[in-house]
UniProtKB/Swiss-Prot annotation:
Name by which UniProt lists this protein: Histone H2B.4
Signal peptide start-end: none
Cross-link (Glycyl lysine isopeptide (Lys-Gly) (interchain with G-Cter in ubiquitin)): K149
Quaternary data: The nucleosome is a histone octamer containing two molecules each of H2A, H2B, H3 and H4 assembled in one H3-H4 heterotetramer and two H2A-H2B heterodimers. The octamer wraps approximately 147 bp of DNA.
PROSITE patterns found in the cross-reference section: HISTONE_H2B
Reported function: Core component of nucleosome. Nucleosomes wrap and compact DNA into chromatin, limiting DNA accessibility to the cellular machineries which require DNA as a template. Histones thereby play a central role in transcription regulation, DNA repair, DNA replication and chromosomal stability. DNA accessibility is regulated via a complex set of post-translational modifications of histones, also called histone code, and nucleosome remodeling.
Chain spans, region Disordered: 1-60
Keyword Acetylation among record annotations: yes
One annotated Gene Ontology cellular component of this protein: nucleus
């Protein structure tokens, strides 16, 4: 509808004086630019904007934590025991730290071997290097079991 408004003043101004044209044209052009920009902005924002806003909100609100998994393991090991929010936060930080150490070590191993891909073998070696003694053996055992379960079914 905006182009119709622009067309009418242009045809009415054709018979008008030159000063009236000079005043009306900038107003008509500004109105036309606004009219053209506004629908395109709305059209662009509605389909993409909603998706982008949701994605941004999800990214902001979805902070990845291990709290749920820590709680599940706690209930498997000690069903009648609870955990405070401060202790849960400490456990979450601990897991993030260990994950970062293992990932860094696996990345280094991958670079040493001049291979672009970090495989389960690099992860296993990194776990052996990062974790001490018996803990490393149990972690490797559980990791191997998890990979076997994942690949088989």
């Amino acid at each position: 509808m905006a182009p119709k408004k622009d067309e009418k003043p242009a045809t009415a101004e054709a018979g008008a004086e030159a000063p009236a044209k000079a005043e009306a044209k900038p107003k008509a052009e500004k109105a036309a630019k606004k009219a053209k920009k506004e629908p395109s902005k709305k059209a662009a924002k509605e389909p993409k904007g909603d998706g982008e806003k949701k994605d941004k909100k999800k990214k902001k609100s979805a902070v990845e934590t291990y709290k749920l998994y820590i709680y599940k393991v706690l209930k498997q090991v000690h069903p009648d025991t609870g955990i405070s929010s401060k202790a849960m936060s400490i456990m979450n930080s601990f897991i993030n730290d260990i994950f970062e150490k293992v990932a860094t070590e696996a990345s280094k191993l991958s670079r040493y071997n001049k291979k672009p891909t970090v495989t389960s073998r690099e992860i296993q070696t990194a776990v052996r290097l990062v974790l001490p003694g018996e803990l490393a053996k149990h972690a490797v055992s559980e990791g191997t079991k998890a990979v076997t379960k994942f690949t088989s079914g």
